[in-house]
Amino acid sequence: MRVSWETVTRPPKHPFRISRTTGHEAGAERVWVHIECDGVEGWGEADPNSYYGESARTVIAALEQMRSVVEAARGPEALESIERDIERAVNHSRSARAAVSTALHDLVGKRAGLPLWKMWGLSPAEAPQSSFTIGLDEPDVLRRKVEEAAGYPILKVKLGTDRDEEVLRIIRQGAGDKVLRVDANAAWEAEEALEKIAMLADFGVEFVEQPLPPDDRDGYRFLHGKSALPVIVDESCVDSSDIPGLVGLAHGINIKLAKCGGPREGLRMIHTARSCGLQVMIGCMLESTLGIAPAAHLASLVDYADLDGAALLATDPFVGPGLQGAEIRVGDGPGLGVERA
């Protein structure tokens, strides 16, 4: 096998603001990974996020370390052992590992002539609808974003400032009776969160994501018994090893393949969460269709989906599995089923 990569820039349609940043702090620069074997090529995307200490530079450094491990393998089919060897060689840059894992799965599927969902024995028709994310912005821009999301029955609203009630009121007025979900990106403290969540419930919000800092276990324990809404954690749950410790602290987890290390670990997280009685959401970074596709193949296993990353980009250079409106579609193309646009 031969491993190569390229660095590209794909900015969002709008500056993507959340509570801990101003402007689009990550995701514009990404790395596309190619793994070739016997004339067949698998693709993957690394979307590094500075919140996790990653950048295109750290991804490339990790890929340099991974290259020899992958190229020493006889073929891509021994996924478990290859990924185990990669993790031993590189215990950082999960987005780089996710890109390599995705490219390997794509390669195996193409060589077998099967889409990933068939390799995993899944039923794509069971996938939930995806939400569409509304980032923090000024009132007139918020109204325009809600109009742009007309085809989406579920909106995910970013909060975490002193304007939370104003933002939610504007979006509820524009969205009518659509389902609203809220992501605070760890902006609140426990007592504040309890009050904010009561306000969210008054606006008919379905659940709240990551209300507290990732390591505030006492705060999550406090909220778990008092919150008016279910609590889903994102930043508090990086990979499957975090999940058992979240029982009694949260009602569910948000899996992102760029955060956990790829589709193989994502699948492990889903099964671990189910065994712990937790709900499962699958999300994404601001990824192109290439980055979204493996999550789309897994989506039939989850309760909630937020796979709108490619829809938030100014341009998407790929076509394939992802969203058709709010519906998650994967098709029968081999591997990821992704092609250049």
Please annotate each region the language model reported.
Residues V157, D162-C284, S288-A299, A314-A326:
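Catalytic core of soluble alpha/beta enzymes
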Residues D308-L312:
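Mobile, glycine-enriched helix-loop/loop "lid" segments at the mouths of ligand-binding/catalytic clefts
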Residues M1-L180, N185-L194, A198-D202, K226, ...:
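N-terminal capping/lid subdomain adjacent to the active-site entrance of alpha/beta enzymes
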Residues D303-D306:
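Short helix/strand-capping turn motifs
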